[in-house]
């Protein structure tokens, strides 16, 4: 059973699940946030306005994702590809997420590559590459009210 403290993050469940699937056997924790080290560094390499380039610490990551479900709700994640690095601490995962924009009901699809460093079975560094144009386009439609899906 998922810890009730993570209930506000259910909009991200498909992301959490595919991330844990990609890192299975390498990290400990029942929930994605439990796999994150307290002093983790998150880097977002392709960003859009309002999104940070870097976060320091697990609590900062949790705070960033706290309002995610107000804008986007994911209903699936797939296309997982796992790459091993020459550095045994590093895993590269590719995946796609699918969802909808809350304000408009428009579809949201994005692709990611995440370079993840693990130490002592916790994620200590996460470098994220995403299709920021897809995110910007979807969210700008939401802010202008364009493309209401049926």
Label each PLM-derived region with a short phrase.
Residues 1-35, 144-150:
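Short, low-complexity N-terminal intrinsically disordered segments enriched in polar/charged residues
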Residues 2-7, 67-150:
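A beta-strand edge to alpha-helix "cap/lid" segment located at domain peripheries
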Residues 9, 30-89:
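A solvent-exposed, acidic/Ser-Thr-rich amphipathic alpha-helical stretch
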Residues 14-17, 34, 63, 67, ...:
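Charged/polar, solvent-exposed surface patches and flexible loops
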Residues 15-25, 49-54, 69-73, 94-96:
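Short, mixed-charge, low-aromatic patches
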Residues 24-26, 48-49, 89, 103-105:
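Short, solvent-exposed loop/turn segments that connect beta-strands within catalytic domains
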């Amino acid at each position: 059973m998922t810890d009730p403290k993570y209930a506000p993050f259910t909009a991200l469940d498909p992301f959490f699940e595919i991330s844990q699937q990609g890192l299975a056997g390498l990290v400990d924790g029942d929930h994605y946030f439990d796999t994150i080290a307290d002093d983790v560094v998150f880097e977002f390499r392709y960003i859009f306005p309002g999104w940070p380039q870097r976060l320091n610490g697990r609590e900062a990551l949790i705070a960033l994702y706290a309002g995610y479900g107000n804008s986007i709700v994911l209903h699936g994640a797939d296309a997982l590809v796992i790459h091993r690095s020459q550095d045994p601490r590093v895993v590269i995962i590719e995946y796609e997420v699918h969802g909808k924009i809350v304000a408009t009901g428009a579809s949201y699809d994005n692709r990611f590559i995440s370079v993840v460093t693990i130490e002592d079975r916790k994620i200590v560094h996460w470098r994220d590459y995403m299709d920021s144009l897809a995110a910007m386009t979807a969210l700008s439609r939401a802010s202008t009210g364009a493309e209401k899906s049926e």
